[in-house]
């Protein structure tokens, strides 16, 4: 006789990752309860945890594919309809007093990433959950404790305006809990009381502050809406992403010491922008608005988190930033979190967690095996995108201007376009336009680098050999051979340092 596959699933966190997890569990017949510390995220008065009103997200293939597997086509259509395609980077600079901009396409096949508004995405997911009968949403509930051996959790209801004495704590039983409550995760904190978790947290010496480029007086974009705009500056950078209201959401990334200098004097701020980010002020943001936004908007740190395992027994698994907060420089934080959900439920399906013909006891054992398999697979990928995101910061703030970066990109894109059978792709294309595991991306890119390096050195050696033969025939030209040998050694050193 077939057993019921219904499980009680508690999800902590109603952001995009937690909401997608709820849709996946609900689609499999589970009874789902979602608990969120903040008020209803669809309410404009709800204050985000980072105290910023709007953060644009880069939504790419991994995130879209994960949402696609929820089988909610109308929801996905709504999100993408309001998103803005970004076909590449637009690099800004100034030479000899003249402003310039140079476009760098993301992909030779015309693929693009999407600038999506966080609230639009989150609202669409929450609206879908509210229409789902086996899902219940609980806002203003803080996770205060959990017993992951007894499968119990405690939440404190915190209604704004209530005194602490009026707060009520409730107990919730569950079959398993998904922690999707961000970098400062309470789920992870309580899981670490039961699992032996290796945990690494790092704050890099970079702060970020949000700015806004308004639309023109005619209500249009001031700069190209189909690019991610970058003003690179070695130690810092300024970026701008398009928004649906024809404005741009901008971010200044800089060391804490640089922020301190900017805060010391309004003139320092204006001079710094003129020197390092030419064309931003006054062309796109007035000096008054620039100063006001810098003083009003918070200057926030960037956190990077690695941990393992991502689960305990059959009762809890953490996903998204709770498991692997990454720096924002690859635009993969959201995409990796949404991909977590697809991978997790695919593994649970593979292990028969939702098989109607097994007993509750066997279902628990299957879930335990699935969570272990998820940890074993996902840790390598989570650590990989963490490392890639750190590396991409250097590329964005300086590497995009280097000739060697452009050379390698050109070679790899040429091979991708004209010899597709080789399976050659740039690192960016593999990360943003495929569902290849992040850990496999690193291996593939390293392999390509070695092959390019071998071809590069071979070309130099061939040239040296030709000149050597000529020099042997004409001894008076032997000095040419010496020069070429020296040049070959130097180029080889450059290649190894840049492309290894």
Curated annotation (Swiss-Prot):
Keywords: FAD, Flavoprotein, Membrane, Mitochondrion, Mitochondrion outer membrane, Monooxygenase, NADP, Oxidoreductase, Pyridine nucleotide biosynthesis. SUPFAM superfamilies: FAD/NAD(P)-binding domain. Its cofactor is FAD. Its EC number is 1.14.13.9. It holds the Pfam family FAD_binding_3. Its main location: mitochondrion. It is found in: Mitochondrion outer membrane. This is Kynurenine 3-monooxygenase. It comes from Aspergillus terreus (strain NIH 2624 / FGSC A1156). The lineage of its organism: Eukaryota, Fungi, Dikarya, Ascomycota, Pezizomycotina.
């Amino acid at each position: 006789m077939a057993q019921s596959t219904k499980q009680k699933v508690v999800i902590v966190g109603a952001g995009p990752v937690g909401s997608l997890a709820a849709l996946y569990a609900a689609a499999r017949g589970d009874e789902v309860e979602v608990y969120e510390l903040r008020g209803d995220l669809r309410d404009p008065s709800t204050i985000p945890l980072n105290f910023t009103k709007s953060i644009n997200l880069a939504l790419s293939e991994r995130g879209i594919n994960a949402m696609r597997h929820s089988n909610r086509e109308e929801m996905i259509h709504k999100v993408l309809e309001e998103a803005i395609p970004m076909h590449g980077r637009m690099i800004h600079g100034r030479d000899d007093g003249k402003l310039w901009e140079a476009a760098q396409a993301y992909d030779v096949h015309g693929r693009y990433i999407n600038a999506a508004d966080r609230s639009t995405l989150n609202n669409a997911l929450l609206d879908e959950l509210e229409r789902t009968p086996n899902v219940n949403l609980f806002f203003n509930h803080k996770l205060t404790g959990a017993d992951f051996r007894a499968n119990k959790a405690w939440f404190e209801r915190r209604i704004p305006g209530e005194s602490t004495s009026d707060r009520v704590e409730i107990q919730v039983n569950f079959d398993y809990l998904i922690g999707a409550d961000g970098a400062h995760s309470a789920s992870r904190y309580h899981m670490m009381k039961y699992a032996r978790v290796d945990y690494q947290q790092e704050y890099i010496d970079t702060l970020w502050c949000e700015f806004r480029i308004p639309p023109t007086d005619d209500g249009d974009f001031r700069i190209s809406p189909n690019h991610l705009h970058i003003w690179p500056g070695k130690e810092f950078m300024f970026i701008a992403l398009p928004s649906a209201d024809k404005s741009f959401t901008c971010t200044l990334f800089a060391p804490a010491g640089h922020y301190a200098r900017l805060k010391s004097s309004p003139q320092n701020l204006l001079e710094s922008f003129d020197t390092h980010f030419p064309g931003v002020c006054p062309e796109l943001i007035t000096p008054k608005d620039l100063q006001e936004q810098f003083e009003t908007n918070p200057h926030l740190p960037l956190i990077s988190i690695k941990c393992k395992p991502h689960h305990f027994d059959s009762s809890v698994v953490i996903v998204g930033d709770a498991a692997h907060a990454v720096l924002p420089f690859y635009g993969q934080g959201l995409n990796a979190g949404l991909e977590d959900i697809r991978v997790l439920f695919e593994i649970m399906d593979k292990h028969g967690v939702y098989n109607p013909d097994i007993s509750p006891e066997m279902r628990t054992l299957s879930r335990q095996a699935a969570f272990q398999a998820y940890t074993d697979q996902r840790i390598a990928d989570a650590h990989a995108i963490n490392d890639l995101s750190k590396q991409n910061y250097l590329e964005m703030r300086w590497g995009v201007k280097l000739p060697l970066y452009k050379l390698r990109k050109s070679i790899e894109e040429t091979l991708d376009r004209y010899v597709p059978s080789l399976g050659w792709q740039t690192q960016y294309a593999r990360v943003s336009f495929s569902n290849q595991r992040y850990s496999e991306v690193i291996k593939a890119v390293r392999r390509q680098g070695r092959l390019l390096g071998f071809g590069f050195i071979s070309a130099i050696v061939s040239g040296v050999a030709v000149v050597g033969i000529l020099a042997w025939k004409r001894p008076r030209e032997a000095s040419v051979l010496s020069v070429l040998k020296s040049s070959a050694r130097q180029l080889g050193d450059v290649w190894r340092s840049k492309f290894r």
